[in-house]
Amino acid sequence: MAKKKAFIPFFYFLSIVFLPWLISLCCNKSLKTWITNWWNTRQCETFLNDIQEKSFLEKFIQLEELFQLDEMIKEYPETNLQQFRLGIHKETIQFIKIHNEYNIHTILHFSTNLISFVILSGYSFWGKEKLFILNSWVQEFLYNLSDTIKAFSILLLTDLCIGFHSPHGWELMIGYIYKDFGFAHYEQILSGLVSTFPVILDTIFKYWIFRYLNRVSPSLVVIYHAIND
């Protein structure tokens, strides 16, 4: 009975790890049809907002200019002019489909992540006791480690997260989060986050070493600086 109670927090931790993935999988399947139908019905009333309409018209004008250039070079007869109009029509439909798919994808992923966050927050709130036991286990495990292993682990973690080679990893991670939420890839925003986020983490970490580790374990700080140097 004691062993069973001891493993409850561990299973609770596993459920927290895998719960968002299960929620995302279920919500994607259940919400996709509903969001697609809702978006297609809504599109009958309003097609584009001002920004989307401007972007769409720019692409359409570029396409039309290419067709007109091709027409001037080849000196299209009347039959080919009909093909030109048909090509414009097909490309317009294709632009609309791409636009609709992008918006459906964005709404679906944002809704799924929002639902996952709400459910996971409630799940964590109702399991405070299990989280408290799990936190005690982690603290006991870390306390039993030697200062050398602690310093090595801290140094390894900081080099992975805020080392000179970390920007590529942050770029992949932030890009994955953008994709998971269904947002478009914006190079300027991505570059700004990659260049500032590791610096903020580095500052927080140094402050933590100065305020917490110096008070709790001065020997660990000495070993950390010795390894780092």
Curated annotation (Swiss-Prot):
GO CC annotation, single? chloroplast inner membrane
Pfam families registered for this protein in UniProt? CemA
Localization annotation: Plastid, Chloroplast inner membrane
GO terms in the biological process aspect are: potassium ion transmembrane transport; regulation of intracellular pH
Q: Which family does it belong to?
A: Belongs to the CemA family.
**Known function:** Contributes to K(+)/H(+) antiport activity by supporting proton efflux to control proton extrusion and homeostasis in chloroplasts in a light-dependent manner to modulate photosynthesis. Prevents excessive induction of non-photochemical quenching (NPQ) under continuous-light conditions. Indirectly promotes efficient inorganic carbon uptake into chloroplasts.
Protein's name in the database? Potassium/proton antiporter CemA
Its source organism is Arabidopsis thaliana
